[in-house]
């Protein structure tokens, strides 16, 4: 364009055109409209409820809480996760569309907290079930800390590359009742192998030779009589 023939158009065009990349535009739109799925099970979730008030006003970050995982791209776990709740949490995470993010809020969610000491029914860290993007320690964390975690997640989203999101395929991590871990690729059907989740401890810990020898010795007539 000849700036001599159109001087006014040249001056206004410089203030109206924004040059950016498709990746940056996608990141900007996602970090400005995070829709969280609130997974609160304990007292830490009460601190997150304080963000809804006018003092902190979490609406300025574009957060819109959703009740369905299919409409959410962020799951915020707060509180203790038990072994019976582990399959439900994994199922909720798998139902969320990509890209999706996780914020672990509170000591009980991150490490199991005081409930994980000599406990057979508490998951020792939610990162053993689903991948966590931001850890938020505290018992419970303050609302200011929750805002700081959301800010850090927004910075992480702004630096993401589309190629890296396509290349990274996350797998399901199954947590058994014996605190053993199994990795299996996602099939996106919502169905899970209950035999893997609830396998009996005696068949997996006792060797085969000793197990059958023990059965034969108990069922022998000499020991029964």
Curated annotation (Swiss-Prot):
Manner of cofactor binding, per the entry note: Binds 1 [4Fe-4S] cluster.
Main location: plastid
Protein's membrane topology: Peripheral membrane protein
Quaternary structure and interacting proteins, as annotated: NDH is composed of at least 16 different subunits, 5 of which are encoded in the nucleus.
Matches recorded under PANTHER family: NADH DEHYDROGENASE (PTHR11995), NADH DEHYDROGENASE [UBIQUINONE] IRON-SULFUR PROTEIN 7, MITOCHONDRIAL (PTHR11995:SF14)
Disulfide bond as UniProt keyword: no
Species the sequence originates in: Nicotiana tomentosiformis (Tobacco)
GO molecular-function terms, A-Z: 4 iron, 4 sulfur cluster binding; iron ion binding; NADH dehydrogenase (ubiquinone) activity; quinone binding
Reactions catalysed: a plastoquinone + NADH + (n+1) H(+)(in) = a plastoquinol + NAD(+) + n H(+)(out); a plastoquinone + NADPH + (n+1) H(+)(in) = a plastoquinol + NADP(+) + n H(+)(out)
Location within or outside the cell: Plastid, Chloroplast thylakoid membrane
EC number: 7.1.1.-
This protein's UniProt keywords: 4Fe-4S, Chloroplast, Iron, Iron-sulfur, Membrane, Metal-binding, NAD, NADP, Plastid, Plastoquinone, Quinone, Thylakoid, Translocase, Transport
Residues the entry annotates as binding [4Fe-4S] cluster: 43-44, 108, 139
Classification via Pfam families: Oxidored_q6
Example GO biological process: aerobic respiration
Annotated protein name in UniProt: NAD(P)H-quinone oxidoreductase subunit K, chloroplastic
Family that this chain belongs to: Belongs to the complex I 20 kDa subunit family.
SUPFAM superfamilies per UniProt: HydA/Nqo6-like
Record-annotated disulphide pairs: none
């Amino acid at each position: 364009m000849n700036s001599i023939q159109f001087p006014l158009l040249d001056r206004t065009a410089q203030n109206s055109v924004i040059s950016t990349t498709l990746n940056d535009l996608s990141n900007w739109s996602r970090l400005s409209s995070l829709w969280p799925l609130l997974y609160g099970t304990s007292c830490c979730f009460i601190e997150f409820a304080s963000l809804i008030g006018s003092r902190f006003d979490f609406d300025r970050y574009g957060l819109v809480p959703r009740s369905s995982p299919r409409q959410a791209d962020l799951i915020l776990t707060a509180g203790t996760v038990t072994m019976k709740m582990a399959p439900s949490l994994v199922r909720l995470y798998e139902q969320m569309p990509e890209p999706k993010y996780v914020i672990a809020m509170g000591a009980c969610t991150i490490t199991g907290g005081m409930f994980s000491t000599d406990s057979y029914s508490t998951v020792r860290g939610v990162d053993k079930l689903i991948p966590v993007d931001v850890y938020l320690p505290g018992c419970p964390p303050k609302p200011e800390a929750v805002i700081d975690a959301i800010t850090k997640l927004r910075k992480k989203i702004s630096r993401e590359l589309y190629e890296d999101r396509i290349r990274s395929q996350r797998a399901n991590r199954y947590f058994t009742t014996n605190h053993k871990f199994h990795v299996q690729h996602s099939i996106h059907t919502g169905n899970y192998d209950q035999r893997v989740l609830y396998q009996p401890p005696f068949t997996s810990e006792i060797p085969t030779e000793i197990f059958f020898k023990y059965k034969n010795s108990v069922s022998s007539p000499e020991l029964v009589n």
